[in-house]
């Protein structure tokens, strides 16, 4: 099946991302990319797919951008020439190299004698986030007047 190319030009990055999201949800298309144009903060959204899907996605994106007063231009090229489609779509093999395999290192068990030291058990929990005093009865979220050190702020 022949791929078609859809272009939607909107003003602003946030609107471009929102339009791309709406178009991807509306039809079975592939988002080729978002490209910043020169001046005025315009962005071009490039999509590919079969003709009906691209037309449906572009019409959805046009109505979405028009409601938000950000539509600049739109175009669906049903049967683009070989040079246009190959020039606007970069192959994935060039853009994303295959990840290098990671070596598998066997996990050795650490004897209990050499285990990492645990936190001391006698450490008291700090409940007041104002004075950080473990003896303070105030809990986080309670009024500041319940803090033991409520009148002593700013003193060293």
UniProtKB/Swiss-Prot annotation:
Residues 4-89 form the BMC domain. GO terms for cellular component: bacterial microcompartment. Artificial BMCs can be made in E.coli by expressing pduA-pduB/B'-pduJ-pduK-pduN-pduU-pduT (in this order); pduT and pduU are optional, while pduA, pduB/B', pduJ, pduK and pduN are essential. A construct with the reversed gene order does not make BMCs. Ethanogenic BMCs can be made in E.coli by targeting pyruvate decarboxylase (pdc) and alcohol dehydrogenase (adh) to them. PduP(1-18)-Pdc and PduD(1-18)-Adh strains targeted to the BMC (PduA, PduB, PduJ, PduK, PduN, PduU) make significantly more ethanol than strains where Pdc and Adh are not targeted to the BMC. SUPFAM superfamilies: CcmK-like. Might bind an [Fe-S] cluster in vivo. Pfam families: BMC. It comes from the Bacteria. Residues 106-116 have a biased composition (Basic and acidic residues). One of its GO terms (biological process) is propanediol catabolic process. Residues 81-119 are annotated as: Disordered. Pathway: Polyol metabolism; 1,2-propanediol degradation. Gene3D superfamilies: 3.30.70.1710. It is found in: Bacterial microcompartment. Its cofactor is Fe cation. SMART domains: BMC (SM00877). Keywords: Bacterial microcompartment, Iron. Its main location: other. Belongs to the bacterial microcompartments protein family. Interacts with shell protein PduA and assembly protein PduM. Interacts with PduP, probably with its first 18 residues. A minor shell protein of the bacterial microcompartment (BMC) dedicated to 1,2-propanediol (1,2-PD) degradation. This is Bacterial microcompartment shell protein PduK. The gene is pduK.
